[in-house]
Amino acid sequence: MKLIIGLGNPGKEYSGNRHNVGFQCLSRFAKDNHISFDKKCCLSRTGSGRINDEEIVLAKPQTYMNLSGKAASQLLRRYNLKAADIIVVQDDLDLPAGKIRLRLGGSAGGHNGISSIITDIGTKEFIRLKIGIGKPDSRNNGTEVVDHVLGNFGGEEREIMDKAITRASEALTCLLTFGLDTASNRFNS
């Protein structure tokens, strides 16, 4: 069994935010695989299904981003899983908008949701699917990081991100089917 956790903030007011790209990707993946988020469990909205005979659980924590680890640790206990069984889908400021990268382990890189998960599950050794949202443009009236991640994608940027979310959904399927090395070689950009 694999647990795929998409990171984001709950609530309609956050749904289009850059910081919610993990939720957006998981919604796309669920739609592509006919999975609905029809349960509430472990501080999360969850759905389950199968990909190539592998049972999967999708989870969108309903804590705020900075408390995502509470949901992740409850989910691991509920399903009796190890960190090696989870995949976390996250936004990444350090990647240009629309780029994706699969990676096992590593630091939180300043991402408070990832930091919370590392703290609460006690390890950084889990797979992350990072979706680039780019850094704020320093020429753009000094936009702060918080304003950037909680801002919505604009016109051209939205088109780039829609394609990235589709590609990230495909990367999840490849990861579940062929493993991390093959998926990384195919999708890391």
From Swiss-Prot:
One of its GO terms (cellular component) is cytoplasm. It catalyses: an N-acyl-L-alpha-aminoacyl-tRNA + H2O = an N-acyl-L-amino acid + a tRNA + H(+). The record marks 91 as: Stabilizes the basic form of H active site to accept a proton. GO terms for molecular function: peptidyl-tRNA hydrolase activity; tRNA binding. Its EC number is 3.1.1.29. It comes from the Bacteria. GO terms for biological process: protein quality control for misfolded or incompletely synthesized proteins; rescue of stalled ribosome. TRNA binds at residues 14, 64, 66, 112. It is found in: Cytoplasm. The record marks 9 as: Discriminates between blocked and unblocked aminoacyl-tRNA. Hydrolyzes ribosome-free peptidyl-tRNAs (with 1 or more amino acids incorporated), which drop off the ribosome during protein synthesis, or as a result of ribosome stalling. Catalyzes the release of premature peptidyl moieties from peptidyl-tRNA molecules trapped in stalled 50S ribosomal subunits, and thus maintains levels of free tRNAs and 50S ribosomes. This is Peptidyl-tRNA hydrolase. It comes from Dehalococcoides mccartyi (strain ATCC BAA-2266 / KCTC 15142 / 195) (Dehalococcoides ethenogenes (strain 195)). The gene is pth.
